[in-house]
Regions:
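Conserved AMP-binding/adenylation subdomain of ANL enzymes
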Residues: 157-174, 182-221, 235-237
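Conserved pre-ATP/AMP-binding loop-to-beta segment of ANL
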Residues: 17-18, 121-138, 145, 168-174
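Conserved structural elements of the adenylate-forming
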Residues: 35-41, 149-170, 178-182, 188, ...
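Gly/Ser/Thr-rich phosphate-binding loop
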Residues: 219-224, 233-293, 306
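Conserved AMP-binding A3 loop
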Residues: 29-33, 134-161
Length: 467
């Protein structure tokens, strides 16, 4: 059996290829047949440009139907697809091109699609073995240089099949797709669920309140980062009526604030389904489709995925095993070795605890851990207290160098308030060693492309606060 992911996706396309695959804001649509034809022509063009199986194809392209076709064409041709954030500068791109050594670097997928129109479609799909690489996804690189997580055809297929089942996708779904397609969430999780189900996607170039509100009546499922949901909640047109017909709202890529979960349920009567994943493993756990979705929890391991807490008990590093997890980092044997335990489990670097029934709760990143006066402080615990205070939109708790404590607990708060009052309110609920020594008020917290708060940037900015 050909293990190529594109062969699997194609086998699930609707028998009637006139069925819509991508529906654009202007009302135009790309049928499954047109998608298939465009992919085949682009795959043939990749071959003509010298792309052989195993070669890397890098793309830093505007989100468009052509950009999606390029990804699928890369799979069909047996190349390794390398999606790059459209916000990266030339200097940043230089690192990825040097590290991955792609055969081809595409910045204009539409131009490539036009060129491919005159090429006969590739008449076969590269027969991939299960361990053959399909994609190279560079991690956000919050610690030093970004590393390229290697994902095989089998890795991607296993996760996609598990998600379709876990989230109950079918051909009667319509997915509202406003995510970027340069990362796991938008390119793999969202796209694969739709294509495996033969379902259409409402294809928005980016999240824009007007476009999302216009598309919502036709959708059944929406996937988003937490920022999408906080923006919808700030939108008066987003009412219980506007959301009533929706089957599912899914959130991931960054932690969903418990206050946002509660506000969303109060507004719509629906609970956002939060799930947990990372570039190296794709999706790991999910709250249940039917069953209790709890604020602050990322739910249960997907079928085939095993999760354990290092050191067991009430808080430790989350370690995982399963068919969707990377074999390691591109040309980086040392980082690959460091990423796995002696018995072969992948070390996520996330801190969490597990309920007896297997439900997972996360409390931050291991590298965000603050050690103050020799005591471990988990920022998430403090952030939950601060986020409940009046005037606080969102908080980020970091450790800053301190001559006496080693690290001092410091809160950076988006919002307004009085430093002394915030510290007093926190002290009423937290041990002294966990209470922020200083509170800094800002307009907005800095975020990376995935909507994650960039604590490393805050640590650099305020490094000298305590002398």
């Amino acid at each position: 059996v050909n293990q190529n992911l594109y062969a699997l996706l194609q086998s699930r396309f609707p028998a009637d290829r006139a069925a819509r695959c991508l529906i654009l804001p202007g009302g135009e649509a790309v049928s499954y047949g047109a998608l298939e034809d465009g992919v085949g022509r682009m795959a043939a063009l990749l071959r003509a440009k010298g792309v052989q199986p195993g070669d890397r194809v890098a793309a830093q392209a505007r989100k468009s139907p052509a950009a999606l076709m390029l990804y699928l064409a890369s799979l069909q041709a047996g190349a390794v697809f390398l999606p790059l954030n459209t916000a990266y500068t030339e200097a940043e791109i230089g690192y990825f091109l040097q590290d991955a050594e792609p055969r081809l670097f595409v910045q204009d997928a539409e131009a490539l699609a036009r060129e491919a129109e005159s090429v006969a479609p590739l008449d076969h799909t590269h027969p991939a073995g299960p361990d053959e690489l399909a994609a190279l996804v560079y991690t956000s690189g919050t610690t030093g240089r970004a590393k390229g997580a290697m994902l095989s055809h089998a890795n991607l297929a296993a996760n996609a099949l598990a998600l379709v089942e876990a989230w109950g996708f079918s051909s009667s779904d319509v997915l509202l797709h406003a995510l970027p397609i340069f990362h796991v969430h938008g390119l793999f999780v969202a796209v694969h669920c739709a294509l495996l189900s033969g379902a259409p996607m409402l294809w928005l170039e980016r999240f824009d309140e007007d476009a999302v509100m216009a598309a919502l009546p036709r959708a059944t499922v929406m996937m988003g980062v937490p920022t999408f949901y906080s923006r919808l909640l700030a939108e008066p047109r987003f009412t219980a009526e506007a959301a009533a017909h929706m089957r599912l709202f899914i959130s991931g890529s960054a932690p969903l604030l418990e206050s946002a979960f509660a506000a969303f349920e109060a507004r719509t009567g629906k609970r956002i389904l939060e799930r947990y994943g990372m570039s190296e493993a794709q999706m790991i756990t999910t709250n249940p489709l039917s069953g209790e979705r709890l604020a602050g929890s990322v739910g249960y391991p997907l079928p085939g995925v095993s999760v354990r807490i290092a050191g067991g008990g009430d808080g430790g590093v989350v370690e995982i095993r399963g068919p969707s997890i990377t074999s390691g980092y591109w040309r980086n044997a040392e980082k690959t070795r460091d990423a796995f335990t002696a018995d072969g489990w992948f070390i996520t670097g996330d801190i969490g605890r597990m309920d007896p029934d297997g439900r997972l709760w996360l409390s931050g990143r291991a590298n965000d851990l603050i050690i103050s006066g020799g005591l471990n402080v988990y920022p998430k615990e403090i952030e939950l207290v601060l986020d409940d205070l009046p005037g606080v939109v969102e908080s980020a708790v970091i450790g800053l160098p301190h001559p006496d404590f080693g690290e001092a607990v410091t809160a950076v708060i988006a919002g307004s308030g009085d430093e002394g009052a915030v510290i007093a309110a926190a002290r009423a609920k937290l041990a002294a060693f966990k209470t922020p020594k200083r509170v800094i008020f800002v307009g907005d917290l800095p975020r990376n492309a995935m909507g994650k708060v960039e604590k490393a940037a805050l640590r650099r900015q305020y490094a000298g606060l305590f002398g």
